[in-house]
């Protein structure tokens, strides 16, 4: 509408004055988000966060906007929550061996599955961080976590039987998926006392040979590391702005 166009034009002009992007670049950014299906209110709520993440990551706006808009949808999050998401990504880049490209590639594979399986965005990003620290990044991290989360939540009969045998509960009494980190913690306890060969065989039964390397890494690093990262993400409000200020 005419009113929306005026709002966005004024907003682009303001961003041109208050950010490193020109009014023209801001307008192009808005057009991109509009094509992604965002309305005027969503664009005005989310754009400043994406602009900051663009500066913080050193990547081009189109790449960052594509990653953020796609992943928000995949995680079932709204544009109003874009700040929470960009802060999570900024925290990840500052604290683990990952960057914008590897994060985007990983989350493309795992975000839809994590959301439908009932695992939180924060725990999912934490798992990607932990894998990145071990040199497992991008699509390899994404496909590994996709297999892990699917098999943990019942996609594979052998995995379900093995988890039951180990006494590892995936769902709580109300049928809701338990915390990913809590499940990893219980797996750690269940594997305690086994030989390395027994641990490998057990984890292989749960996730299969293509995901065993990454899954073993997560379990060996332990839930404490995942919890540390998850806590950091949950307390990361303002991380995007802070990182953009540093990089800018």
What function would you assign to each model-found segment?
Residues 1, 16, 72, 79-152, ...:
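Amphipathic/coiled-coil alpha-helical interface segments used
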Residues 1-15:
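Short extracytoplasmic
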Residues 5, 24-26, 196-199:
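Short amphipathic alpha-helical segments that mediate assembly, nucleic-acid/protein binding
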Residues 20-22, 28-43:
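Solvent-exposed, membrane-proximal periplasmic/extracellular interface segments of envelope transport
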Residues 25, 29, 63-65, 141-145, ...:
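Gly/Ala-rich hydrophobic membrane-inserting helices
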Residues 48-75:
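Carboxylate/His-rich catalytic cores and anion/metal-binding grooves
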